[in-house]
Amino acid sequence: MSSREISNAMSGISNQTAKDILKSEYPTIYNAYKDIADEQFELFAKKHLDYGMGNISAGTQLVNEGEINFAMTGLWYRLSDKINRWKNMIITNRKAQNESLIDTFQDITNYGIISQIVYKDLWKEN
């Protein structure tokens, strides 16, 4: 072991990433998160291919702040609908009639990621 490796080991510094440590210390959570993330991405891809670019850009080109804010407002409404559905299901203790609670979680997650893509000005075809 080199002196640097010894020094790093003694000071608790490691080349491990947070994901490496999570995988080691919490393998069930690590694997579940990865599986769900993969499922989310597949669901996003299928829906994006069905809806296309205009669903999120709301008919705009997302070329200026006003258009981006318009799209972000639309995303906020979609998220708000899903969160209110979740809240209503919890408060009323009712079983879902059309979509499962998992479907609601998936939609919230994907709309959150899409919002980040739009906010970072990356909602583009190329």
Where are these regions (language model features)?
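Intrinsically disordered, low-complexity regulatory regions
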Residues: 1-126
